[in-house]
Amino acid sequence: MYIEMIDETKQVSQEMMEQTIDLLNFAAKTIGKEDKEMAVTFVTNDRSHALNLEYRDTDRPTDVISLEYKPELPIAFSQEDLELDPDLAGMLQEFDAYIGELFISVDKAHEQAEAYGHSFEREMGFLAVHGFLHINGYDHYTPEEEKEMFTLQEEILTAYGLTRQ
């Protein structure tokens, strides 16, 4: 899976970025999404607050914002169009591959790691997997959805080696 990494905070180590990429690739393999593309941006609480207000109409910072890419209308071209412009077929594959982006608040990750008594690495991993599952259609609005999503995210984190301890 191709993952574009952006650190707006300038606080995320190269090792943490590599762990995030590795973990998301592991999660993608687990749910059969290895051929997809996404972006992860590490942000401050101020930026998280602004994004949360803009996209969720919630006036406070949050730990992770998941923006699933769902084109409203399918992009369709005729066979003739595709034959006349070979780059068009490649471009369509790229659109189909892009699943969305995550904005992870580094500030919130530090706060929550301390509050929950586990490592910053575990919290960053949790937020990445949680957001990744959201952009792949998982949610936790109902008890059934919550059980499915939370069980899967814990299985991924444990299998990867990021336990709560």
From Swiss-Prot:
It is found in: Cytoplasm. One of its GO terms (biological process) is rRNA processing. Keywords: Cytoplasm, Endonuclease, Hydrolase, Metal-binding, Nuclease, Ribosome biogenesis, rRNA processing, Zinc. Zn(2+) binds at H130, H134, H140. GO terms for molecular function: metalloendopeptidase activity; RNA endonuclease activity; zinc ion binding. Pfam families: YbeY (PF02130). One of its GO terms (cellular component) is cytoplasm. Belongs to the endoribonuclease YbeY family. Single strand-specific metallo-endoribonuclease involved in late-stage 70S ribosome quality control and in maturation of the 3' terminus of the 16S rRNA. This is Endoribonuclease YbeY.
